[in-house]
Design a protein with these regions (language model features):
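Internal alpha/beta loop-helix hairpins
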Residues: 1-63, 86
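Non-catalytic connector elements of ABC transporters
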Residues: 40-42, 50-164
Length: 164
């Protein structure tokens, strides 16, 4: 994505989004663009509440979530919360603060990629999510292993809410 100042993403001959590389990666305008440009977690849900710059999303797969979102969303609308794996944190304890999103599950797989590892977690609902964790210590010192029960946490502004 460092080849040009602006990138055009096409799907079956239709131009879907034109923007800078950071804009396309951080603010995709559709699920298709989000998935095409990199690893992504998609959580489907319904808008339960709209506040000042934030929405509450009710999801059968992940419970009630908070996310930063534009004001034009209305309660009852079907949406998808897009979360990049590197925006998630993984640990043994639920978040300390009330404003963090969280989901519990088990580590199903760990993919070591050198500078980081991808953790695949199966949530209690059955949804599989990925979290990318920087390998800042030696591989033998990682405390979280396959089969461990853990929590995924993320801030409301970590994701992007999409309607298509």
């Amino acid at each position: 994505m460092t080849v040009a100042d602006r990138i055009g993403v096409m799907d079956r001959g239709e131009l879907i989004q034109v923007a800078t590389a950071p804009e396309i990666y951080e603010q995709p305008n559709s699920r298709w663009v989000a998935d095409f440009i990199g690893e992504v977690n998609l959580i489907e849900g319904t808008i339960a509440e709209v506040g000042a710059g934030e929405v509450a999303i009710e999801s059968p797969a992940a419970g009630c979530l908070r996310a930063a979102a534009p004001a034009e969303l209305a309660p009852g609308a079907t949406v998808w919360l897009v979360l990049r794996p590197e925006k998630l944190r993984i640990g043994y304890a639920p978040p300390a603060g009330p404003h963090e999103n969280c989901a519990a599950g088990k580590v199903a797989h760990i993919g070591y990629r050198g500078d980081f590892s991808i953790y695949k977690l199966q949530l209690d609902s059955g949804l599989v999510m990925k979290a990318a964790v920087a390998n800042t210590t030696r591989a033998t010192e990682h405390p979280i292993g396959v089969g461990d029960r853990v929590w995924l946490t993320w801030a409301p502004e970590a994701g992007v809410v999409l309607t298509r």
